Amino acid sequence: MKRYFILLFIFNFSFSQTTLMINNENSTINYDAKHVLHAWEGINDNVSGVIIYDNEISKIAIAAKVVDFDSGNSGRDSHSLEVLEALKFPNIKFYSDDSETEGNAITFNGDIEFHGQKKSIKVLGTVDDNENLINVTGKFQIIPSEFSIKLPSFMLIEMEDYLNISFDIQFDK
């Protein structure tokens, strides 16, 4: 009987999953955008999220407030909040329960919700898993017009219709 309980405990433990919260002090999401006349970038260092982990990431959910992106130019940021209708659509969210890992490379097949629209995307990244933390980095691109965003213009020329997104997200064990 004692063996049965020990085996049952080991069996249950081997299938346990751990929920890890994001360390938002050490996590960022960056974007860069371009116009014919100039390029700019912004950073959000107030990111929320969680992963389900059992020797690899099986699920991930990340959220960031639109208002927390900072390009270093308050006028541009203010105009961005208007264009992105931040009062109506305050958050950007990503969720995946379908990931593929090969070595330290990871592919998340998931959904991004931006400007009230949800789209399926593939996000490529790397995972650095050590004793105290899991660090996930990567890049992807989104096309604002696919999210019903009217592109802002300067001197009658619209900005380019893509945003490069990069992320460096840390989860403490």
What is the predicted function of each stretch?
Residues 3-16:
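Sec-dependent N-terminal signal peptides
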Residues 17-173:
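Low-complexity, acidic/polar, glycine-enriched regions of mature
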